Swiss-Prot record:
Family affiliation: Belongs to the DNA polymerase type-C family. PolC subfamily.
Name this polypeptide is given: DNA polymerase III PolC-type
Cited CDD domains: DEDDh (cd06127), PHP_PolIIIA_POLC (cd07435), polC_OBF (cd04484)
Enzyme Commission numbers on file: 2.7.7.7
Segments traversing the membrane: none
Coiled coil segments of this chain: none
GO BP annotations listed: DNA-templated DNA replication
Gene, per the UniProt record: polC
Reactions catalysed according to its record: DNA(n) + a 2'-deoxyribonucleoside 5'-triphosphate = DNA(n+1) + diphosphate
Keywords on record: Cytoplasm, DNA replication, DNA-directed DNA polymerase, Exonuclease, Hydrolase, Nuclease, Nucleotidyltransferase, Transferase
Highest rank taxon of the organism: Bacteria
Length: 1465
């Protein structure tokens, strides 16, 4: 027994007989960890063997009891040299385990503590009944049992459960018999009670009839019991139990109806201890309505039985009773006018760091009666637009700010340099070891130095210093210094004076000198000694500037790189000597490579212009004071993201100074330079820095608590002193001190969501750096950073005294908020770019084309439509938008590509005339290409001009051209024609980059930006974060809790991006900072385009956005045109062969059985998916108008399924008459007799899914008008089901392109298949595709089976689509050839007669670059060997092997070497 252990036994008065037992003979205390803040002591004991259970219990009880008397909590564990696995000892310790947390939860203890254990096959086996041998107990409790046995001294045991059938049956039998006994007892009790009642009743003649069973009274009794029942925390439920009562919030609801008409409400609730799945049944609609209170966000009390759901296999409450309860949200209890203003709040736009939306932040502040609230996201202002709109709505001032990353422009290598020859100087290279990073709160424990001259050590200094307290385990672990090193150490003042003498007449040198010098100066100042004034060289900055190509410049990496010995890193003497050796290497390289000989040159000639990239970041809060400040803020954000981005957006101090007008600065959090100075350098240094700012921030002590864990501050008292020091800094610098909350979430219970988000970043993130080392090392806890009310903040700062707390929390924040003006973040008008004579050009182009087609004078219907549209377009300043689109389309046309239109632009006849869209929105009509005579059908009898019968012009006999889709202009620019036009265009994917550059060319580089987007954490991603958090931090959550945590963690900004085709154009009479900052997408500083910092939707009503999207259809059409020489414009839209594809397969020369589908829709854009092919099979369209209907029906929401489909099946309506596209509603209702304005309004309500959301009075007015004009009821009911509708102009553009592609499939099939595989096919399997029909059909069958079993991969699903087309092509008599080393193209399929030759990229794993390299190499000569193919062709060994297996390489040898036999044969 060690002396220390014996002393402890004396203190706890351990019985002598136990102390003298063999168990204690070699007992020792390995380690004691003391946690001063929490008053917890952890003992780690060593024994020769596991203690007898009685001895263990005695030791445990006496240890706990003795230390409890001193208000100290104790835990201990044991390491035993020998372990006894006898069943009796294991059984005794097994039962003991349930007396210790965390094995003593009620459900675990009650279910497991009485079970028997045995030791078999190196495992502790628990014999358990089957109903508790489940994953829940294995996952949630067995790990705790393993840990407890390890603490008992058994080492790491493997513990498992086995089901004991006999026990299961016995317990089940006991349960049944017990329940039966209870039932029988209840019956007997009722009989006894009945007899007692009868005995008390009056004589028979006076008897009254026996009272009937009062159902209402029984319900009332049950309800009363429900009201009074104890609430069970959800976290305590771990097994099936009856009549449990929960209270909590509903966060997910799903209602289902069974085939029998019963309803199931599946919902999830949380009480913030955990979450639970619940289920409530309702027998019919009437009963279902009683449970309308089960809604997302509702607070409920529920009672029911906990059972294992047979489908989800998780515990679920079957709800018997439910009641809505009042949940009392936190309130700000201070009177009006005495409420604080929050000046430091993050929203979910703070990347992977904060949770609240800006709307919820502002709403909470407004609800609490705060007059203002600030937004200070990390380095971005992406929440500004939404914050601006919400604040105006809520009637509260939004203060727009950010928490910036401030850096010095140039970080000096030398401090206080003088004119001195570096070669002749004497250097004192020193290092200090400390108990922490704070010079004000931590202590020096070692100073060591090497005095060096011309590379030689001439004298050394090495002294330990006693800090006056035991060293922490963290300090010892980091530095290697123990309390023994400090036993005979000199006093601090003595060492400081000696070191000052040692340093005279020298240049001081240290690695990361700002820390070492700062620590020394703080100690000099504390002891009234002169601070350092001589020159200092920082070897960290020296290395960064001398060797910028190195990624790491720490002392360890540098000594390894330069082969300098560093045996004991983090002991000052070794570090100082190593730093000295490095110094002279650096001086030599600086002299030889940069000509640096004088100390002054280090900063002037060596410090790089971009040294800000390596500078230490300090946080500052920047606020917009006025409109000038807003623009400067936008400029700063842009510069930090574009010019000064390095890991994070940085703002150099001089850049901030240049744009400071209209901005106010706060000192931010513990990462700010003023706070850092208070902690590391003292109040005087902090005052000097504070003068740069407009106010000093202090935060609640709880926010600074992680600094205690990191040993930067000693304890709570230390935190409070730092806050007092900051207030003193404000007083001396004459700066107001504001108490801010550093808000990262709104409610205290939301802390876990941020924890999950932050920990998902991994240990590479600074916030997740672990404290200490080893497997058990954990990151510092995150601070309690919820949005605090005024009274909560006053409580946090109560230690300052009532008056001072009120001043910093309320008065100063209100006064500072008053200094800030209201600003306009989002402009109220549209600012279009300027193009000279845009209005005249649009009008001229429109009439020029109209005259060309329809003659001059124009038909009245054309003339009036043009006049109406131009009045709107020119009058509202939209001409430049039209002209810009026309210029882009025209340029792409000139490069040989068609451009398809999207959206409703085809509703504009002006857009048609100037060439933006091919869709003609006029009523169906004939027009003569020779004499321009025209005929218009305006009665609605024809849906599309393409469906008109062919006929000659009655005037000149020339065959008429047919056109017109009958689309009103109102669907594009609104009824009054003043809606900002949104022109979306489908360019060929091949030509899209050129089209984007066209925008720059037209408007200028400085005015064209990609439309920015913000990517947030999706719920599925958040789910992964939660599961990762479970794994990494030893948590176990039930499924409902995982769902809640994932939902809470979702929505946080993760990255930025760009719209695939959106280009924002800034007017050339303004600059981009009038609207938004700019940045690179996803922080990719190599990107060729800058994006808007704001999500483009936030400013889409202020600036022009051009949607220049890439699409396969124009690419496909261009490919077909190149192959055939046919101009796609000349392809008729009513080709009989093409239309025949929609009714059968005969036109393809195959049967439905051969190609597996009854029509010829495979591979036709818009109509080739399984869903639309099914619609075609049901409706059998025969006209272009019906194809438009199909397109609208397939793209809408609740337009086909459960709506038009049923009407057609039941014979109520036809494909022609159902509602298909949004525009059809307005046209149909006008033809029915409704006023255009009402027809338009009804269309708008229906297409946006608002029909059932508008007031009943408004809806009934529309219904009455429709019925008055004989609109059938089925039509009205159909309107009520629709959620979203497709524009007819969009459908027309898509269908027109589709029919052109289909034309080639019918009339030029090999060209069609060549284009399809070159452009549309997503997956290839060449071995199958070139293997013939049998191979193709077999593979399709294989994938079909996998699909049925949900086993098919995404690649296989894509491959199936490809194989469908291959199968069709082969069935039509064409062939699919093999890859040919000398004939295949790199990326395009080739036509050889009736055979398609695949390109190299069709081979799995072979990319475009390798394909092109092979083509280039074969032009230089034949490949003589596989080695040569790999070398010259760039193909990997795997690809060459794959080619060989497919027979592509023939008999190609492995290498070029000729064998002996080649000379003879």
């Amino acid at each position: 027994m060690s002396d220390l252990f014996a002393k402890l036994m004396d203190q706890i008065e351990m019985p002598l007989d136990m102390r003298r037992s063999s168990a204690f003979s070699s007992a020792d205390i390995i380690e004691v960890k003391v946690h001063s803040v929490s008053r917890l002591w952890e003992f780690h004991f060593a024994f020769a063997a596991v203690l007898p259970i009685a001895t263990y219990r005695e030791l445990h009880d006496r240890l706990i009891r003795t230390f409890e008397a001193a208000d100290i909590k104790v835990t201990f564990d044991i390491q035993a040299a020998q372990v006894d696995y006898s069943d009796d000892l294991l059984q005794a310790y097994y039962q003991e385990a349930f007396e210790h947390a965390p094995c003593n939860s009620a459900s675990f203890k009650s279910s497991f503590s009485k079970l028997k254990v045995t030791y078999e096959d190196d495992k502790l086996i628990i014999a358990a009944p089957g109903f508790v041998n489940n994953d829940h107990f294995r996952k949630n409790h067995l790990p705790n049992l393993v840990k407890q046995f390890e603490a008992f001294g058994f080492g790491t045991l493997t513990i498992d459960m086995v089901s004991d059938q006999e026990m299961t049956e016995h317990l089940t039998k006991d349960f049944v018999s017990s329940r039966q006994a209870l039932v029988e007892k209840a019956v007997q009790d009722n009989l006894e009670a009945q007899k007692s009642l009868e005995a008390m009743m009056p004589p028979a003649e006076e008897a009254t009839p026996a009272p009937k069973f009062d159902y209402k009274e029984r319900v009332a009794q049950r309800q009363a019991g429900f009201e009074k029942a104890a609430i069970t925390p959800m976290i305590e439920i771990e097994t099936e139990e009856n009549r449990i009562v929960f209270e909590g919030m509903v966060f997910d609801v799903e209602r289902k109806t069974t085939r029998t008409g019963r309803h199931i409400i599946n919902f999830k609730m949380t009480d913030y201890t955990s979450s639970f799945a619940l289920q409530k049944w309702a027998k019919d609609d009437e009963e279902l309505r009683k449970f309308d209170m089960i809604a997302k966000g509702a607070w409920l009390r529920v009672q029911g039985n906990i059972e294992t759901n047979p489908f989800t296999k998780s515990l679920t409450m079957n709800v018997q009773q439910v009641k809505e309860i009042v949940h009392h949200d936190r309130k700000d209890l201070m009177p009006e006018g005495q409420k604080r203003v929050e000046f430091h709040a993050h929203t979910n736009m703070s990347t992977m760091d904060a949770l609240p939306t800006v709307e919820s932040l502002i709403d909470t502040a407004a609800k609490w009666g705060h007059k203002a609230v600030a937004i200070t996201d990390h380095a971005n202002v992406q929440s500004f637009p939404h914050g601006y709109h919400r604040a105006r709505k809520a009637g509260i001032k939004a203060i727009f700010g950010l928490e910036a990353n401030i850096v010095e422009d140039k970080v000096p290598i030398s401090y206080d340099p003088v004119d001195m020859d570096l070669h002749e100087a004497t250097y004192v290279v020193f290092d200090v070891e400390t108990t922490g990073l704070s010079a004000m709160n931590n202590d020096l424990i070692q100073i060591a130095a090497s005095k060096m001259f011309k590379g030689n050590i001439v004298e050394q200094f090495d002294e330990f210093i006693d800090p006056g307290h035991p060293l922490s385990a963290f300090t010892t672990e980091l530095t290697g210094i123990t309390d023994k090193h400090l036993q005979d150490a000199k006093p601090l003042v003595t060492v400081l004076k000696a070191f000052q003498d040692f340093c005279k007449d020298s240049i001081l040198v240290a690695h990361n000198a700002s820390f070492d010098v700062g620590f020394m100066n703080a100690n000099y100042e504390r002891h009234d000694l002169p601070k350092i004034t001589q020159p200092v060289i920082d070897t960290l900055e020296f290395a960064r500037n001398l060797y910028p190509e190195y990624k790491r410049h720490g002392l360890g990496p540098l000594t390894k790189r330069f082969q300098v010995s560093l045996d004991h890193h983090h002991m000052a003497n070794y570090d100082a000597e190593a730093t000295g050796r490095l110094l002279f290497i650096f001086l030599k390289d600086a002299r030889e490579k940069h000509g640096i000989k004088n100390l002054l040159q280090l900063n002037t000639d060596l410090v790089a212009e971009d040294s800000y990239k390596k500078a230490r970041i300090k946080h500052a809060t920047i606020y917009v004071q006025n409109q000038v400040g807003l623009k400067n803020m936008f400029k700063l954000v842009s510069l930090s993201n574009i010019k000064y981005f390095e890991g994070v957006p940085r703002i150099p101090r001089t850049v901030l100074d240049a744009h400071r007008e209209g901005l106010l600065l706060g000192t931010a959090c513990s990462d700010g330079e003023v706070f850092d100075a208070v902690l590391t350098k003292g109040i005087d240094a902090a005052v000097d820095l504070a003068k740069y700012y407009d106010f000093i921030e202090i935060m609640p002590p709880a926010i600074y608590q992680p600094l205690v864990v990191r040993e930067l501050i000693k304890d709570q008292a230390g935190i409070e002193q730092v806050i007092r020091d900051l207030i003193e800094v404000g007083k001396r610098a004459n700066k107001p001190v504001l108490a801010t909350g550093n808000v990262h979430y709104l409610e205290p219970e939301e802390e876990i969501y941020r924890e999950i988000i932050v920990r998902s970043l991994g240990q590479g993130a600074m916030i997740n750096r672990t404290i200490g080392r080893g497997e058990g090392a954990q990151p510092a806890p995150l601070p309690k950073a919820h949005f605090r009310t005024t009274n909560e903040m006053l409580d946090e700062f109560a230690f300052l005294g009532k008056d001072l707390a009120y001043q910093v929390v309320v008065e100063n924040t209100q006064d500072f908020a008053d200094r800030i003006e209201e600003v306009e973040v989002v402009k109220g008008d549209l600012y279009t770019p300027y193009i000279d004579k845009a209005e005249e050009t649009v009008a001229e182009l429109t009439y020029q084309k109209a005259f060309e087609i329809y003659g001059n004078p124009l038909p009245d219907i054309i003339d009036l439509r043009i006049e109406k549209e131009l009045t709107s377009i020119l009058g509202n300043g939209f001409a430049v938008i039209y002209l810009a689109s026309q210029m882009l389309v025209n340029r792409s046309n000139e490069r040989g590509y068609l451009v398809g239109s999207r959206g409703s632009v085809g509703s504009s006849f002006v857009a048609t005339m100037i060439g933006i869209t091919e869709v003609n929105p006029m009523p169906p009509h004939y027009v003569c290409p020779s004499c321009q005579h025209s005929e218009f059908i305006t009665d609605g009898s024809v849906g599309s001009g393409y469906d008109l019968p062919n006929k000659p012009c009655p005037k000149c006999g020339t065959p008429y051209q047919k056109d017109g889709q009958d689309i009103p202009f109102e669907t594009f620019l609104g009824f009054d024609g003043d809606k900002v036009p949104d022109i979306d265009l489908n360019f060929s994917g091949d030509d899209q980059p050129s089209a984007h550059l066209d925008v720059r060319d037209i408007f200028g580089d400085e005015y064209a930006f990609r439309a920015g987007t913000v990517g947030t954490v999706a719920e599925k991603t958040a789910y992964g974060f939660v599961k990762g958090y479970e794994r990494d931090y030893g948590k176990f959550y039930r499924d409902a809790e995982v769902d809640r945590l994932a939902a809470g963690a979702a929505g946080v900004k993760r990255t930025t991006g760009q719209h695939p085709g959106g280009i924002v154009v800034i007017p050339n009479y303004m600059d981009v900072y009038d609207f938004t900052p700019v940045q690179y997408p996803a922080d990719d500083v190599t990107a060729s385009w800058q994006t808007t910092h704001f999500n483009f939707h936030d400013i889409d009503e202020n600036v022009l956005k051009l949607d220049i999207l890439g699409h396969d259809d124009p690419t496909m059409i261009r490919k077909l045109q190149d192959l055939s020489g046919i101009d796609p414009i000349t392809i008729p839209a009513d080709d009989p062969g093409v239309m025949a594809l929609f009714s059968g397969t005969e036109v393809l020369g195959v049967t439905p059985e051969q190609i597996g589908t009854p029509t010829g829709m495979l591979g036709i854009p818009e109509f080739g998916t399984n869903f639309v092919r099914g619609m075609v099979n049901e409706t059998h369209p025969t006209t272009f108008a019906e194809l438009l209907q199909l397109s609208g029906l397939s793209h809408g929401t609740d337009v086909w399924l459960g709506n038009a489909q049923d009407l057609i099946k039941e014979g109520i309506a036809t494909l022609k008459t159902v509602i298909g596209c949004r525009d059809d509603i307005m046209v149909y209702l006008m033809h029915a007799g409704l006023e255009p304005k009402m027809a338009f309004t009804i269309m708008e309500r229906v297409r946006k899914g608002l029909w059932l959301k508008i007031s009943e009075e408004e809806r009934n007015g529309y219904i009455d008008a429709m019925r008055e004009n004989n609109v059938p009821d089925w039509y009205i009911e159909s309107c009520g089901k629709i959620k979203y509708m497709f524009p007819k102009a969009h459908a027309a553009a898509y269908v027109l392109m589709a029919l052109r592609v289909a034309y080639f499939k019918v009339h030029h099939p090999i060209m069609y298949y060549c284009a399809y595989f070159s452009i549309r096919a997503k997956a290839f399997e060449l071995k199958t595709m070139s293997g013939g029909l049998d191979a193709v059909k077999a593979r399709m069958e294989d994938i079909t089976i996998k699909r049925k079993n949900n086993e098919a991969t995404n690649v296989e699903n894509d491959l199936f689509t490809t194989l469908e087309i291959v199968n069709e092509m082969l069935e039509r008599g064409f062939k699919f050839g093999k890859l040919d080393l000398y004939k295949s193209d790199a990326i395009e399929f080739q036509i050889k007669g009736d055979t398609l030759i695949p390109p190299f990229i069709a081979l799995e794993g072979l990319g475009e670059n390798v394909g092109k390299q092979i083509v280039k190499a074969r032009q230089e000569g034949e490949f003589l060997s596989k080695m040569e193919l790999r070398k010259r062709g760039g193909a990997s060994s795997t690809l060459v092997e794959k080619m060989d297996e497919m027979g592509i390489l023939g008999n190609m040898p492995e290498d070029n070497q000729l064998s002996l036999f080649d000379d003879f044969f």
